[in-house]
Amino acid sequence: ACPKGASYEAGIVCRITKPALLVLNQETAKVVQTAFQRAGYPDVSGERAVMLLGRVKYGLHNLQISHLSIASSQVELVDAKTIDVAIQNVSVVFKGTLNYSYTSAWGLGINQSVDFEIDSAIDLQINTELTCDAGSVRTNAPDCYLAFHKLLLHLQGEREPGWLKQLFTNFISFTLKLILKRQVCNEINTISNIMADFVQTRAASILSDGDIGVDISVTGAPVITATYLESHHKGHFTHKNVSEAFPLRAFPPGLLGDSRMLYFWFSDQVLNSLARAAFQEGRLVLSLTGDEFKKVLETQGFDTNQEIFQELSRGLPTGQAQVAVHCLKVPKISCQNRGVVVSSSVAVTFRFPRPDGREAVAYRFEEDIITTVQASYSQKKLFLHLLDFQCVPASGRAGSSANLSVALRTEAKAVSNLTESRSESLQSSLRSLIATVGIPEVMSRLEVAFTALMNSKGLDLFEIINPEIITLDGCLLLQMDFGFPKHLLVDFLQSLS
């Protein structure tokens, strides 16, 4: 069981509003149809006393559905209680075999078997509670009602005597009502829990990649109001199933509205948790070949024949050069009203190997970089917008140097021919290069990488309408509308088969 209360501590919050439920309700019929078809209908046997015939033994066997259709359904949210679904005019045709036996007035034992169909019309009312157990959302439908508006028995060929049809119409009506209520309601409850697990597992999959996972266990029972339902999750990212848990913040419900279909709230602690996992995974690294670096520079309008580049390469062929950028420690992320602020310490290395392979020129320097970024999503792509940046030499850290480190490596010695003034000039030029070319290039590659990752998780299959990414102090908000996710329904129904 999970606690209930007025304070909701979480790293991630998901709010689904009434407009979203109305869209999702469009395909409720298919889920209910699956419940009817998956439900097992047991054989029933017994006996009854019939005037003039004595004891009549009977049995219903192989009861199954031959036709099923649903006219309409409605959904309502009952504040602090349940999700109520009303399904009208469920038309069901059952078929099966009726066995009966009795002793005739002449002392003969009569044992007959006849196929039958039952044509029925039913209304279904399901009131579902949301709870949680062991970090997962659970559903419970204590109120599940079936109302029969029609129940007609058709015996095979209608050749049997009228008393038989009358007798078994009454019996089958009573028996079928009991069986349907028990079996169908139980199956609906089972499918509801399977769906809850399916959604939570799919959400975790979207946020995971490789050895990076996420713990989206719920921190309390979901909240139901008259206009939305809401779940609260831990949001701890993991690396190789190991996470560094952080204290969860209290989520203020007033931050999210109910006019859009879907809302997400992310504490910036979650973003820091993701950055830590990515750093541990070794993903915060960028490597370019000389030709790739040259192409990047030319794309930004730089003349690679300038003196600075000749000084860098020292006349060595740039095609075999290597440029590497990597984070020295876990970046720090904070959400502010103006955007997402990322503080990172990076090392940049330029390496120019000589053709003989015996020596190479290498340049390395370290920078503390602070960027302020806003994000948007459109046309199934993520876009990052650089609002501001600062590049500061890493002179304040123990063991680091503000000066450019230059080395000419040979088999026997290491020498440097750069004068101090020339080194400072080159260093200044390289820092300018990082600011004007490096940061935009990294952001561009992040856009492509994040978009590819999201699409690999199937995000491009969703019809996301007018998404907004909003930053506030301490949190990131996503809000959007959407079309019915038919691919998810197909996947879910296939998982039931």
UniProtKB/Swiss-Prot annotation:
UniProt note on tissues of expression: Expressed by the liver.
Catalytic function, reaction form: cholesteryl (9Z-octadecenoate)(in) = cholesteryl (9Z-octadecenoate)(out); 1,2,3-tri-(9Z-octadecenoyl)-glycerol(in) = 1,2,3-tri-(9Z-octadecenoyl)-glycerol(out); cholesteryl (9Z,12Z)-octadecadienoate(in) = cholesteryl (9Z,12Z)-octadecadienoate(out)
Main location: secreted
Pfam families for this protein: LBP_BPI_CETP, LBP_BPI_CETP_C
GO biological process, one term: phosphatidylcholine metabolic process
SS bond partners: 144-185
Keyword terms: Cholesterol metabolism, Disulfide bond, Glycoprotein, Lipid metabolism, Lipid transport, Secreted, Signal, Steroid metabolism, Sterol metabolism, Transport
Record's GO cellular component terms: extracellular space; high-density lipoprotein particle
Glycan-linked positions: 89, 99, 111, 241, 403, 417
CDD domains cross-referenced by the UniProt entry: BPI1
Signal peptide as annotated in the record: 1
SUPFAM superfamilies to which the protein is assigned, alphabetical: Bactericidal permeability-increasing protein, BPI
Domain of life the protein comes from: Eukaryota
Subcellular location(s) per record: Secreted
Database matches in InterPro entries: Bactericidal_perm-incr_a/b_dom, Cholesteryl_ester_transfer, Lipid-bd_serum_glycop_C, Lipid-bd_serum_glycop_CS, Lipid-bd_serum_glycop_N
GO molecular function, one term: phospholipid transporter activity
Free-text function comment from the UniProt entry: Involved in the transfer of neutral lipids, including cholesteryl ester and triglyceride, among lipoprotein particles. Allows the net movement of cholesteryl ester from high density lipoproteins/HDL to triglyceride-rich very low density lipoproteins/VLDL, and the equimolar transport of triglyceride from VLDL to HDL. Regulates the reverse cholesterol transport, by which excess cholesterol is removed from peripheral tissues and returned to the liver for elimination.
Family matches, as PANTHER family: CHOLESTERYL ESTER TRANSFER PROTEIN
Membership in a protein family: Belongs to the BPI/LBP/Plunc superfamily. BPI/LBP family.
Protein name as catalogued: Cholesteryl ester transfer protein
Classification of source organism: Eukaryota, Metazoa, Chordata, Craniata, Vertebrata
